[in-house]
Amino acid sequence: MTELGDWVSIDPDSDKPLFDQLRVQIIDGIRDGRLSPGTRLPTVRELATHVGLAVNTVARSYRELEAAGVLETRGRFGTFVARADPADAAMAAAANSFAEAARSLGISRDDALRYIESALD
């Protein structure tokens, strides 16, 4: 298990929500190699105690990262860094959300792709 709490820094005075600060720092830790794929993370309660956050705040960060495919929970064994590239998982989640929104608004595939191309330019 990694000592995630040793390098996570939460700024309670920031405009950015606490759960999002933690979420971003976990992603950064994966990208820069501090957290390798398969690394077991501290339990929600352990990390909350170590960094001084509420249990629900840490749980929300873990849930959102799990939904994006960045983390995976293996029942009673704990929460681990997923084996997939977090950028791939995050982009897939964003693409799925965009596609869902486009479908619900009745936007055609071609029009939806034009929105993407315009946003990338």
From Swiss-Prot:
<dbReference type="InterPro" id="IPR036388">
    <property type="entry name" value="WH-like_DNA-bd_sf"/>
</dbReference>
<keyword id="KW-0134">Cell wall</keyword>
<dbReference type="GO" id="GO:0005576">
    <property type="term" value="C:extracellular region"/>
</dbReference>
<dbReference type="Pfam" id="PF00392">
    <property type="entry name" value="GntR"/>
</dbReference>
<feature type="DNA-binding region" description="H-T-H motif">
    <location>
        <begin position="44"/>
        <end position="63"/>
    </location>
</feature>
<comment type="function">
    <text>Transcriptional regulator that modulates resistance to vancomycin and aminoglycosides. Negatively regulates the expression of several genes responsive to vancomycin, resulting in decreased susceptibility of bacteria to vancomycin. Negatively regulates the expression of genes encoding the ribosome binding protein Hsp, the small subunit of sulfate adenylyltransferase CysD, the L-lysine-epsilon aminotransferase LAT and the protease HtpX. Also modulates purine metabolism and aminoglycoside antibiotic resistance.</text>
</comment>
<dbReference type="GO" id="GO:0005737">
    <property type="term" value="C:cytoplasm"/>
</dbReference>
<dbReference type="GO" id="GO:0003700">
    <property type="term" value="F:DNA-binding transcription factor activity"/>
</dbReference>
<feature type="domain" description="HTH gntR-type">
    <location>
        <begin position="16"/>
        <end position="84"/>
    </location>
</feature>
<keyword id="KW-0805">Transcription regulation</keyword>
<keyword id="KW-0964">Secreted</keyword>
<keyword id="KW-0804">Transcription</keyword>
<protein>
    <recommendedName>
        <fullName>HTH-type transcriptional regulator MSMEG_5174/MSMEI_5040</fullName>
    </recommendedName>
</protein>
<dbReference type="InterPro" id="IPR000524">
    <property type="entry name" value="Tscrpt_reg_HTH_GntR"/>
</dbReference>
<dbReference type="InterPro" id="IPR036390">
    <property type="entry name" value="WH_DNA-bd_sf"/>
</dbReference>
<dbReference type="GO" id="GO:0003677">
    <property type="term" value="F:DNA binding"/>
</dbReference>
<keyword id="KW-0963">Cytoplasm</keyword>
<keyword id="KW-0238">DNA-binding</keyword>
